[in-house]
């Protein structure tokens, strides 16, 4: 018998959290034969909150029934009105009052497992368990992209030969200052490389640095990855899953990343496939000596997280 499963995020953004929610909801229908409903807060009421993006709202509304809440009572009403059997709530992990009293609650923890609640309490990565000293079953994200061979080099007026390092994610999460310095320095000694940054706060202007707005278009995102020769990842706190790292990795693009982050799920997944720097000098050397096809990304750990494998975990952990 099929279930009606609601997926709740308190706002819809262009970040990995909402990419993950969309994929869970999509494949809950396509692979598990259930019905998916999205629950979030109304764009018009929260449009000035950080990261809220109308593109994300439009994307979800074009695919799913979307219901809006303001408080816990609203959530219960939506659950009753739609005969929802399970509600999958992605949140930091703390007990925050966002829950339903009328169905099974799956609490999907992005940062902490310190306040268990709901019928299922599950982190997005083992690194959260490691940091918190817990042992909850892990519900990882799906890593998938549409098939597309096109890139953006012509559109961005970049020749075919230069090496291109790229990055997307939260606007503020490219935040390691010595990485900014290394980019400035490498552009003084290599004129055959470009940096393209999507949804990234401007930190330096240069003719070989291109800033692009964020997008919810996964085909455009695939073209962006196809344009790049590597991901340059520089989030000081690290990743509790690392969807951007995963999206580059399944396209066999090297992931150049900081090795000292507290949250290190991306390092646990990539293992020896990660291209790690710990200092300005490390990164400068990596960028200076980088050539296309230098690093082998075949059979890297993120390739496990395809829709079939992850939704099998979802069925066994979440749909109890």
Task: Locate the predicted segments by residue.
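Short alpha-helical segment that forms part of, or immediately flanks, the ligand-binding pocket
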Residues: 222, 245-250, 264-265
């Amino acid at each position: 018998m099929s279930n009606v499963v609601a997926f709740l995020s308190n706002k819809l953004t262009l970040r990995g959290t909402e990419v993950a929610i969309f994929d869970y909801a999509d494949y809950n229908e396509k692979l598990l034969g259930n019905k998916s409903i999205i629950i979030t807060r109304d764009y018009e009421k929260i449009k000035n909150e950080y990261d809220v993006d109308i593109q994300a709202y439009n994307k979800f509304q074009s695919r799913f029934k979307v219901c809006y809440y303001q408080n816990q009572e609203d959530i219960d009403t939506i659950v009753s009105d739609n005969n929802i059997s399970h509600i999958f709530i992605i949140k930091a992990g703390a007990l925050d009052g966002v829950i339903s009293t009328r169905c099974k609650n799956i609490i999907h923890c992005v940062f902490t497992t310190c306040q268990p609640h709901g019928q299922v309490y599950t982190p997005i990565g083992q690194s959260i368990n490691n940091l918190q000293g817990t042992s909850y079953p892990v519900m990882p994200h799906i890593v998938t992209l549409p098939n597309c061979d096109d890139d953006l080099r012509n559109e961005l007026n970049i020749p075919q030969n230069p090496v291109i390092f790229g990055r997307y994610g939260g606007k503020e999460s490219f935040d390691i200052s010595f990485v900014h310095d290394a980019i400035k320095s490498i552009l003084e000694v290599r004129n055959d490389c470009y940096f393209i940054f999507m949804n990234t706060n401007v930190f330096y202007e240069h003719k070989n640095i291109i800033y692009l707005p964020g997008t919810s278009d996964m085909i455009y995102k695939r073209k962006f990855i196809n344009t790049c020769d590597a991901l340059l990842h520089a989030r000081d706190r690290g990743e509790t899953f690392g969807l951007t790292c995963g999206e580059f990795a399944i396209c066999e693009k090297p992931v150049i990343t900081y090795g000292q982050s507290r949250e290190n799920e991306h390092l646990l997944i990539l293992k020896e496939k990660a291209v790690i720097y710990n200092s300005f000098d490390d990164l400068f050397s990596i960028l200076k000596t980088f050539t296309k096809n230098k690093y082998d990304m075949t059979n890297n750990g993120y390739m496990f997280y395809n829709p079939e494998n992850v939704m099998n975990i979802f069925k066994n952990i979440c749909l109890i």
